[in-house]
């Protein structure tokens, strides 16, 4: 039975099914085989991936996932699932599905459920506020490939990103303001975005511009001057230069400059995950405190907050 003529597809990166070495190896193999993510020629990359990266990285990453795993499962999936359910409650006349680019729930299964319901319009919303070919571009590639097998296609609206959308900036502003009110204002607010290789930017990826757009808009909304707010890039991987300044190196240098109390927000993550809960909240906190910092606080992602669901609802309405 057809529930709706409108289908909404929320897409996030993905997560292992369990905090175990085999599950993480399966997940990393799929993720790191995406040519949008790693564009090294396969003849060079695949031996490294299978012979070095997967055997050694999977064991290390398993321990990290174990430290953040929630009773309900992986934080990214838990929060993304809550987002899907909350948005579906806001849009009773639409069919709302959640999919992950890598792992479960799969894009193919989610799209099939929507198509078989007879939808005539599909809104695709990658949950990445700032466009990058490595994220939003990869979603487009995967969705396009999946849709090839269907003879009848719905009208498709693809939301490229929402780096400056007023509701997104307002949601971040409200989150930070509440944190300031409860914990006090820090010496500096640091916005940490996921990095990408600098080479990808030279090839045309406008990701850093979109991060800067968010940074400027949020700085203005909060009324913070440059001496009170800054932006950095985290999660570098591999041997080539990534976007700078690096989050970890910046945090290590700040105490010597008199910055003793830092609060970190990761605006590029729509839901808390390994990169925020472990890399930032644990690893980078330790770096800052060991360098002489006195107080490190992490401001949670928007997750399934009312402001986040307001934002998702408004983004869907654009289609």
From Swiss-Prot:
Bridged cysteine pairs (disulfide): none
- EC no.? 4.98.1.1
Q: Name one GO cellular component term.
A: cytoplasm
Give the pathway annotation: Porphyrin-containing compound metabolism; protoheme biosynthesis; protoheme from protoporphyrin-IX: step 1/1
Q: Which residues are Fe cation-binding?
A: 194, 275
HAMAP family to which the protein is assigned, alphabetical: Ferrochelatase
Name of the featured protein: Ferrochelatase
């Amino acid at each position: 039975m057809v529930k709706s003529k409108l289908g909404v597809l929320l897409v996030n990166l993905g997560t292992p099914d369990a905090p175990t070495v085999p599950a993480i190896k399966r997940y990393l193999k799929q993720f790191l085989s995406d040519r949008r993510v790693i564009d090294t020629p396969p003849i060079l990359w695949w031996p490294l991936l299978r012979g070095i990266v997967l055997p050694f990285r999977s064991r290390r990453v398993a321990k990290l996932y174990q430290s953040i795993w929630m009773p309900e499962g992986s934080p990214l999936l838990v929060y993304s699932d809550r987002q899907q359910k909350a948005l579906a409650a806001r849009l009773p006349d639409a069919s709302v599905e959640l999919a992950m680019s890598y792992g479960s729930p799969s894009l193919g299964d989610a799209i099939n459920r929507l198509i078989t319901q007879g939808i005539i319009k599909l809104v695709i919303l990658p949950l990445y506020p700032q466009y990058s070919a490595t994220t939003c571009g990869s979603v487009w590639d995967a969705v396009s490939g999946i849709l090839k097998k269907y003879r009848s296609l719905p009208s498709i609206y693809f939301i490229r990103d929402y780096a400056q959308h007023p509701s997104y900036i307002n949601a971040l502003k409200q989150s930070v303001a509440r944190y300031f009110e409860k914990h006090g204002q820090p010496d500096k607010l640091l916005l940490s975005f996921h990095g990408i290789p600098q080479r990808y930017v030279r090839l045309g990826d406008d990701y850093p511009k979109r991060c800067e757009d968010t940074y400027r808009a949020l700085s203005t909304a909060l009324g913070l001057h440059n001496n009170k707010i800054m932006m950095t890039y985290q999660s570098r991987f591999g041997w080539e230069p990534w976007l700078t300044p690096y989050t970890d190196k910046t945090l290590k240098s700040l105490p010597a400059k008199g910055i003793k109390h830092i609060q970190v927000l990761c605006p590029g993550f729509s839901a808390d995950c390994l990169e925020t809960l472990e890399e930032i909240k644990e690893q980078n906190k330790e770096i800052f405190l060991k360098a002489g910092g006195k107080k490190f606080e992490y401001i949670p992602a928007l997750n399934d907050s009312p402001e986040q669901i307001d934002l998702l609802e408004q983004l869907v309405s654009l289609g």
